[in-house]
Amino acid sequence: VDYPPDIIVVNIRIKKMKTIEDMKLELLSDNSNKFMQTLIDYDIKSKDKYGSNLLHYYIMNYDSIVHPAGVIISEFIKKGLDINDKRKDGRTALYLSVQCQLQDIFEILLNSNADLDIQNVNGNTPLWEAVMRYRGDGFFIEQLLKNGANPDIKNNYGVSPKSLARTIAN
């Protein structure tokens, strides 16, 4: 098509940004290369209706995801994800790793300087959750205490990890 000289033709390709729902599906696929490629154009700070970011989703669906934790979490952090970001219920990635009993993810988050004492909406810390879930393996409790978690932080009901441990005889 010949246009008059006073008309400028602009050809713009608009690339649709992936939503967090799109990325959740990508994360569940078994194609790591495609996921990493898709991650390039993704706004890592996006959240779903529960306030979950992609790291929260990864942790809660860990058993269904084939992508290696170290690589994925490292990429999320490189893209600018705040590992201390909270869901609407106040749970952080570290809290979720304790709740889901995922030692490998827990260690990665500890080594990435996750905040040990952030409280959820009920005032519970990751250490409180570790004490509550204790079933004979003290890994999470030991690691949190060794790394400086405060056992005396009380939740909204006045219960600290230390007092909880005494109450349930842990």
Regions found by a protein language model. Give the residues of each.
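Ankyrin repeat domain, specifically the short helix-to-loop turn at the C-terminus of the second helix
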Residues: 37-43, 74-82, 107-115, 142-150
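N-terminal segments that cap or nucleate solenoid repeat domains
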Residues: 17-57
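Short, Lys/Arg-enriched N-terminal segments with co-localized hydrophobic residues
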Residues: 2-16
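Conserved ankyrin/ankyrin-like repeat signature
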Residues: 34, 68, 72, 104-105, ...
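Ankyrin repeat boundary signal
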Residues: 46-47, 83-86, 116-119, 151-154
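Leucine-rich solenoid repeat scaffolds
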Residues: 145, 150-170
